[in-house]
């Protein structure tokens, strides 16, 4: 893993990378991921971040919380800011990437058989970041001459109930988009991901995880540590 921060023991300066005027450092190190998930002892989580599986560990002598997933992992790499340069990925998958530099757009491409069902989650706001991600899903069909016909399958920004829940007593909503995808036909599909707040922001800390996962019903139990207001 690469640890980035200030006063990192054994860290090397990152040329041209600063935060609030301070030089940042990086360190390549091994990090032991605990077998048991959880963040016991590291404080109360925000509602919006409680959806993500986490594990508490240490890196460079500092306690950290890591996001974890049991999906096959891929790290964003290369020039994929155009549909024609989309990064080919397997499914299911967990892609780790960045909304960086400013105006960054990333494209990914995968194949799916007819009738396959996947949930497509773009996770960033749930990582505790001030982002507003969105996804665009295309179906791509090529003729014998290699010419493409592109059809929009879905364009997803905020979840449908987001606006109605902001400011309510129990608000665990998020700006992260999530879409249930049922493949209409065997073939190729492309996903574009971007941050609506990233037009003028040039910050490598704005990370995301693109998760394409099988449908798997589950139960999540949360508790809110404040008194709820009641109607008169």
Model feature map: region roles:
Residues 1-41, 97-232:
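Acidic, Ser/Thr/Pro-rich low-complexity intrinsically disordered segments
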Residues 5, 54-55, 86, 90-99:
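Glycine-centered structural positions embedded in regular secondary structure
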Residues 42-59, 191-193:
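Short, aromatic- and glycine-rich surface loops/edge beta-strands on solvent-exposed regions
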Residues 59-92, 218:
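Predominantly extracellular/luminal regions of secreted and cell-surface proteins
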